[in-house]
Amino acid sequence: MRVQIDPSALAAELRASRAHLAKIIAGLDGDKLLGPKLTIVNPPLWEIGHVGWFQEFWCLRNSAPGAPPEPFVRGADALYNSATVPHDTRWDLPLPDLDATRSYL
């Protein structure tokens, strides 16, 4: 079943979620960006980028025929696609720094 969502309402919700995420990550730096390597947790820096990738992938790139097939950030699929990036490798990826990751949002 395909659900129709008003594009303006969706855009507003996505902006609100990014603003909320910005508040959550405001104090992250250094070791807090990667955190401990645990089987039940992703690195925070990876999760932040994954939020941007997820919104881009599902809301822009797969929204309609003719949507752009490639990510806006070169290599983003190889970094943030949780279906293809094994969990235990996410700490070792060449992730962008926090400022670049915030820009991706």
Give the ranges of each region predicted by the language model.
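Generic start-of-chain signal for non-secretory N-termini
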Residues: 1-26
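Helix-loop segments that flank and shape redox-cofactor active sites
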Residues: 19-43, 60-69
